[in-house]
């Protein structure tokens, strides 16, 4: 019989006594006992955020010193490894010269070298993005002692392949955190 007051019973102040059943209890009057200034409220909010009462804001650039939990986020991709030359830069706008530059390694449509391609035909017939370098060219190949254990597949936007290839790093452990 809630709400019934028995003789000799003092009224219960709900601001002082709160049970676990009153999680959603809101007091009738705001700031019954103390008034908090906006500066103090901002300071309290910062303290609560530091103590993880709020949802923690993840660092978009995790470091190895942060430990393994920093790398457990599901949206981590191979771009987080920071391999230049394989993935298009987000802030780069393609110009007309970049679109006409020969950059594919597909042997079904084009020769392997840019110079070979210019010697064989019209350089304006191939319209591709310059974000994926041609790894068949010797100037893009790593040194002989560095090229062991790698299988590097650049992106090939030609009609024969129909898929975008990414570098396969077969030396550095499981691919699961980076290729989901």
Swiss-Prot record:
Keyword match Phosphoprotein: no
Subcellular location: Nucleus; Cytoplasm; Cytoplasm, Cytoskeleton, Flagellum axoneme
Superkingdom per UniProt: Eukaryota
Tissues expressing the protein: Testis-specific. Detected in the germ cell lineage at all stages.
InterPro entries linked to this entry: SPMIP9 (IPR029361)
Keyword Signal listed: no
GO BP annotation list: flagellated sperm motility
Sorted UniProt keywords: Cell projection, Cilium, Cytoplasm, Cytoskeleton, Flagellum, Nucleus
One Gene Ontology cellular component annotation held by this UniProt entry: cytoplasm
Role description: Microtubule inner protein (MIP) part of the dynein-decorated doublet microtubules (DMTs) in flagella axoneme.
Complex and partners: Microtubule inner protein component of sperm flagellar doublet microtubules.
Annotated protein name in UniProt: Protein SPMIP9
Taxonomy of the source species: Eukaryota, Metazoa, Chordata, Craniata, Vertebrata
The gene coding this protein: SPMIP9
């Amino acid at each position: 019989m809630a709400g019934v007051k028995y003789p000799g019973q003092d009224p219960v102040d709900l601001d002082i006594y709160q049970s676990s059943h009153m999680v959603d209890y809101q007091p009738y009057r705001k700031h019954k006992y103390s008034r908090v200034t906006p500066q103090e409220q901002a300071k309290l909010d910062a303290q609560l955020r530091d103590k993880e009462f709020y949802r923690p804001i993840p660092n978009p650039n995790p470091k190895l010193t942060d430990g393994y939990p920093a790398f457990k986020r599901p949206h981590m991709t191979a771009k987080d490894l920071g391999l230049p030359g394989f993935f298009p830069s987000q802030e780069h706008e393609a110009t007309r010269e970049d679109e006409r530059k020969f950059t594919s390694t597909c042997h079904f449509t084009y020769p392997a070298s840019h110079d070979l391609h210019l010697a064989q035909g019209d350089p304006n017939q191939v319209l591709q993005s310059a974000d994926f370098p041609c790894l068949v060219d010797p100037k893009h190949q790593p040194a002989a002692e560095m090229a062991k254990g790698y299988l590097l597949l650049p992106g090939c936007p030609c009609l024969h392949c129909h898929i975008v290839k990414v570098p396969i790093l077969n030396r550095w452990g499981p691919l699961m955190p980076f290729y989901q």
